[in-house]
């Protein structure tokens, strides 16, 4: 028992700590208290948030009875997000529109910022700026938020009866059903991170090999796939929330 206890303590103190320290690429750090944070991720995330907040201010400023072109655009975006939420969640989609919309818009603008904004012009002491979703920490954080959201949705709708889904349709599936809830955020985070990182790497390689014409179509393809990835993430998040409220599917 002592050996087993020591092994578990070693895994918790060393193994999990090492796993949490896995990094991709070089990073510029800020020291905040006793923690090191990835400064470039915070910088680019703040830029994306500023763009979204500025757009929101423009959207609600001086609304017209006869919508202008800009107002039409923002209303179209809102209707699109509402349709995605309603399709995946069902009749009780209303309270979840802000959450799904925030996920979609943050990921969409983050992905596009990696292709459209000249991050490389800004020099850092170490590492370089890139899209926030190009960092595994961002995508994991978004996936964990989604996990918290669908657990909250299920518990608020069904109370402790929510956990009965783990033994449906048979208690034999209990380990698999529990494992499924852990794999959902992993699949969300790694899918988004992998696609955005791969897209930026392909563009960088092509620019280094053929700097003029060839990378342009790839960049346009990257813009398209970036939008698709944002839609997939938001759609799956809404589907998970809807599933937790409706029951085991």
UniProtKB/Swiss-Prot annotation:
Q: Where in the cell is it found?
A: Plastid, Chloroplast thylakoid membrane
Q: How does it sit in the membrane?
A: Multi-pass membrane protein
Species lineage: Eukaryota, Viridiplantae, Streptophyta, Embryophyta, Tracheophyta
Q: Name the predominant localization.
A: plastid
Q: Does the keyword Transmembrane apply?
A: yes
Matches recorded under PANTHER family = ATP SYNTHASE SUBUNIT A, CHLOROPLASTIC
* Complex and partners: F-type ATPases have 2 components, CF(1) - the catalytic core - and CF(0) - the membrane proton channel. CF(1) has five subunits: alpha(3), beta(3), gamma(1), delta(1), epsilon(1). CF(0) has four main subunits: a, b, b' and c.
Q: Which UniProt keywords apply?
A: ATP synthesis, CF(0), Chloroplast, Hydrogen ion transport, Ion transport, Membrane, Plastid, Thylakoid, Transmembrane, Transmembrane helix, Transport
Entry function: Key component of the proton channel; it plays a direct role in the translocation of protons across the membrane.
Gene Ontology annotations for the cellular component aspect, listed alphabetically: chloroplast thylakoid membrane; plasma membrane; proton-transporting ATP synthase complex
Q: Which HAMAP family match?
A: ATP_synth_a_bact (MF_01393)
Q: What is this protein called?
A: ATP synthase subunit a, chloroplastic
The similarity comment for this entry is:
Belongs to the ATPase A chain family.
Q: Which domain of life is it from?
A: Eukaryota
Q: Keyword DNA-binding: yes or no?
A: no
**Using the chain's own numbering, where are the disulfide bonds?**
none
Q: Which Pfam families match?
A: ATP-synt_A
Gene name as annotated: atpI
Sorted alphabetically, which InterPro entries does this protein's record hold? ATP_syn_F0_a_bact/chloroplast (IPR045082), ATP_synth_F0_asu (IPR000568), ATP_synth_F0_asu_AS (IPR023011), F0_ATP_A_sf (IPR035908)
The record, for SUPFAM superfamilies, names:
F1F0 ATP synthase subunit A
Q: In Gene Ontology terms, what is one molecular function of this protein?
A: proton-transporting ATP synthase activity, rotational mechanism
Q: Which residues cross the membrane?
A: 40-60, 97-117, 136-156, 201-221, 222-242
């Amino acid at each position: 028992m002592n050996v087993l206890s020591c092994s578990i303590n070693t895994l918790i103190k060393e193994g999990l700590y090492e796993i949490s320290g896995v990094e991709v690429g070089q990073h510029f750090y800020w020291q905040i208290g006793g923690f090191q944070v990835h400064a470039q991720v915070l910088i680019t995330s703040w830029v994306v948030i500023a763009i979204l907040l500025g757009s929101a201010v423009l959207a609600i400023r001086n609304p017209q009875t006869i919508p202008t072109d800009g107002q039409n655009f923002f209303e179209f975006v809102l209707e699109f997000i509402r349709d995605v939420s309603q399709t995946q969640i069902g009749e009780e989609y209303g309270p979840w529109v802000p959450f799904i919309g925030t996920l979609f818009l943050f990921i969409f603008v983050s992905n596009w910022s990696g292709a459209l904004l000249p991050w490389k012009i800004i020099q850092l002491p170490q590492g370089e700026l890139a899209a926030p979703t190009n960092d595994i920490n961002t995508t994991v954080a978004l996936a964990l938020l989604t996990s918290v959201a669908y657990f909250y949705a299920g518990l608020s709708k069904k109370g402790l009866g929510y956990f009965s889904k783990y033994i449906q349709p048979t208690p034999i599936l209990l380990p698999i059903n529990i494992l499924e809830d852990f794999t959902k955020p992993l699949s969300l985070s790694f899918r988004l991170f992998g696609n955005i990182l791969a897209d930026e790497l392909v563009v960088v390689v092509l620019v280094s090999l053929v700097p003029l014409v060839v990378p342009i179509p790839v960049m346009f393809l990257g813009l398209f796939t970036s939008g698709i990835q944002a839609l997939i993430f938001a759609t799956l998040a809404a589907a998970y929330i809807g599933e937790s409220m409706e029951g085991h599917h």
